[in-house]
């Protein structure tokens, strides 16, 4: 505890006379403590039979707080979790966490906040008076003879808990991530490493806090890493090592047109967008590289081409919606796979696809001219793309559709 909910104030943790923290060190075995009185030795006294301070601790001044102060709200959240053994509010609403996880989350966030304190942000989160009290305690810890340490005082614990509680008390992951971004930006501005692999800040933290951390870090990640960590989903998480190969089996090399119609990417053809987004679906939640993901889909594109398209989409206004759709599609394929095994279809030769006699019969029955060989090649390439999910340009008949002699069909 760092605050009193009955009197709406910060707890006092040091003697008003000798400034010694209470119960910081074990008392002498020869001493019988008197409740309510300071049991520390008077300054300058030595030995066992020395005079104790004996100051009445009830007269120690305490800092009053408004009834809705963030420090008191965080204390209420902790007390409720202690009473039930489970944290159910804020980011834990969708996935309740045990008390141990809540304490670990508070320690992880609070420790990082107080290790590199941004006083302007802390003043906004608490108040000028609370921060002034903390600065006074820190100054006394630095220059005082028997001063309390700033990081062990009630005011420091209250500030750390309030700052952490403002994040943990958010209604959802996105809101909590928005409240955490100042902390990540401040750390990076001061040269501290903050990455997806080093952002834990403590052991035993909850999955909910890890999701918030990854979501807050999203703008500092490359597009491929955003997909790997699912930063645009409701529950960002670490990549899984075995999710890519199975998912790629049920994906066409060119992502379904209906999924890609609303993607705006200037200077990039629709086929390139489809092939890049298919690779993006494979990347979601996996550690696979761009080149390996493209290979799983039949090498219809290259890692460099995919990277270029993803970067361009990432700079568009609709990027967040596109990545969210890609992540939702990946989750859908993991839960309920596609009815078509595209990995098997990619191995089909399709050598006897649409014989010329059948093509002529179709054209005559439809009242159109069969045209030259180019028209038949175009129809075969279109069928190849529809059946295999791979680009029609990879079909054996595509050679008839290229070259300077190519004319309108």
Region locations from a protein language model:
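Basic, alpha-helical nucleic-acid-binding regions used in initiation and control of genome expression
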Residues: 1-409
């Amino acid at each position: 505890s760092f605050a009193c909910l009955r009197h709406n104030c910060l707890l006092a943790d040091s003697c008003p006379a000798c400034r010694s923290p209470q119960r910081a060190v074990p008392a002498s075995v020869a001493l019988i403590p008197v409740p309510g009185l300071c049991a520390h030795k008077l300054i300058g006294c030595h030995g066992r039979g020395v005079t104790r301070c004996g100051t009445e601790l009830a007269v120690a001044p305490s800092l009053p707080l408004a009834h809705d102060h963030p420090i008191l709200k965080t204390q209420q959240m902790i007390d409720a979790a202690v009473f039930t053994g489970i944290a159910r509010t804020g980011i834990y609403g969708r996935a309740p966490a045990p008390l141990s996880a809540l304490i670990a989350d508070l320690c992880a966030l609070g420790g990082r906040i107080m290790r590199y304190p941004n006083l302007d942000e802390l003043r906004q989160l608490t108040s000028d008076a609370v921060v002034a009290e903390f600065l006074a305690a820190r100054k006394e810890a630095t220059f005082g003879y028997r001063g309390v340490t700033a990081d062990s005082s009630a005011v420091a614990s209250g500030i750390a808990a309030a700052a952490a509680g403002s994040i943990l008390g958010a209604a959802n992951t996105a809101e909590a991530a928005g409240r955490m971004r100042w902390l990540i930006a401040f750390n990076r501005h001061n040269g501290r490493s903050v990455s997806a692999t080093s952002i834990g800040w403590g052991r035993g933290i909850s999955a909910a806090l890890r999701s918030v951390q990854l979501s807050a870090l999203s703008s500092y990640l490359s597009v491929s890493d955003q997909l790997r960590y699912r930063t645009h989903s409701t529950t960002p998480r670490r990549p899984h090592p075995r999710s890519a190969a199975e998912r790629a089996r049920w994906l066409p090399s060119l992502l379904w047109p209906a999924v890609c119609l609303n993607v705006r990417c200037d200077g990039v053809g629709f086929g390139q967008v489809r092939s890049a987004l298919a690779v993006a679906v494979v990347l979601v939640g996996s550690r696979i590289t761009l080149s390996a993901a493209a290979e799983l889909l039949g090498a219809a594109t290259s890692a460099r081409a995919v990277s270029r398209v993803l970067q361009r989409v990432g700079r568009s206004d609709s990027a967040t919606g596109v990545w969210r759709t890609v992540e939702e599609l990946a989750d859908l394929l993991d839960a309920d796979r596609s009815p078509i095994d595209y990995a098997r279809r990619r191995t089909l030769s399709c050598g006897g696809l649409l014989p010329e006699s059948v093509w002529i019969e179709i054209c005559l029955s439809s009242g159109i001219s069969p045209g030259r060989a180019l028209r038949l090649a175009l129809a075969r390439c279109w069928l190849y793309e529809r059946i295999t999910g791979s680009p029609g340009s990879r079909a054996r008949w595509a050679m008839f559709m290229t070259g300077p002699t190519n004319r309108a069909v």
